[in-house]
Amino acid sequence: MTNLQENLTALSADLAIFERKIQHLAKEMTIDLSHYEIDHLALRVNSEQSAKNWLILLLKCGRILSDNIVNGRKIYLIELEKPVKFANQFVDIIELPLPKNKKYPIEGWEHIEIVMPFLPKESINEWINRVNMYFLXLTQLTIKVSEPKVDGERLPNPSIAVSFTDKTVNHTCIKVHPYSIKKYLRFSKNE
């Protein structure tokens, strides 16, 4: 087994459990993940050392695509040399934010981000209202609307995060954005 294969095995050790939890959440959200691009998978860590360990591991499998400051903290986007299969899609981006003051009950795989594009001539508020309508009647879910602020970024980045209200069994989250992260990065570089 090569070093890359060993690293990918370590990287994906908990991925199958995470995938099942995400599929359960998607079912409760009444969305079919195959209808949407899974843009990237995201990790959460509570310490600088955990972040460093994950970054070392991820860099053995890929390269830094971005290390922007988002909402006051550095978030690494790692582009994998070999995409991982997740929910019958191949995903090549892993998000690794440096820790902030919040403590996560479970470190490791935390959320995915999917793309629900704007409709023609749709405003940000119209997009938020449209996406929100999918989930408002689902009382077992928590919905959080935000717009992450990336230093120097001008493209609107609304986000709708959906998770279970009771996180004791399933702590995962599905975040919805109108653009893929690669499109954001291309747009930022072309300005």
UniProtKB/Swiss-Prot annotation:
<dbReference type="Pfam" id="PF06185">
    <property type="entry name" value="YecM"/>
</dbReference>
<comment type="similarity">
    <text>To E.coli YecM.</text>
</comment>
<protein>
    <recommendedName>
        <fullName>Uncharacterized protein HI_1581/HI_1582</fullName>
    </recommendedName>
</protein>
<dbReference type="InterPro" id="IPR010393">
    <property type="entry name" value="DUF991_YecM-like"/>
</dbReference>
<dbReference type="GO" id="GO:0005829">
    <property type="term" value="C:cytosol"/>
</dbReference>
<dbReference type="InterPro" id="IPR029068">
    <property type="entry name" value="Glyas_Bleomycin-R_OHBP_Dase"/>
</dbReference>
